Amino acid sequence: FIAFNWHALPRMAKFALAEATLAATVLACLWRGPDTIAGTAALAGAALVTGGLLALVGQTYQTGADTFELFAMWALLILPWALAGRQAPLWLIWLALVNLAAQLWFARWGMRAFAGGNANLWTLFLINAAALAAWEMLRAAGLREFLAPWAQRIVALASGVAATAIGVLAVIDAQTPRWLAALAWLAWLGAIWMAFRVRRVDVFVLAGALLSVIVVVALFLGKYLHADNSFFSPLLIAAAVIALATGGAVTLKRLATEEA
């Protein structure tokens, strides 16, 4: 009913509805407590409704603000809630907003000359690598909102996807400084090894790093061996991928058994 009649609602009615929803979610969080599942869900809902309210302001008054400003303001407004709520889902929402705001900013104003037109990928890599490092340090410090393995693995997944994309750039993109991309990818792999193998073991994160290695190595071999037009090139690439996957799987299985 509301969706069907939304355009017919007066301006003030739209704002009243959005603000009432925001107030209801905040009150629900205070009532149930931010440490409960219901309270966490309510606070996450409040964070999402805040974005809807900002979008409504921009749509109603035609502020002319850039899209990145919406996401940046959204992230700024929910930061106190993330700090006060001390819940992993809130920090994941905040990190997603920071990623979106930074990507949109770099896409319009960013360092295209430095990044070779790949500012978005570099932004993703830098933000999520820094977020994973900060998350691990705060987890080691014992802060409860950073102790949940599933949340850190989501951050690690985002970091791994971005790092793999940087590794791919080191192989195929002539516009990107390849030495810099290769160095960044190798540094990420080294940091993952130190944090999730030497200091403690997380098989999920290590499996993601292994997949990154397989993708980049296979692409590297495919590029330089395919140039020879040799009959054996596909066989060598397949053998390398199988060897990496098999060796990695055996190692990960052994680590999982040791941790069990």
Residue ranges and their predicted role:
Residues F1-A260:
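Alpha-helical multi-pass membrane segments and their bilayer interfacial helix-loop junctions
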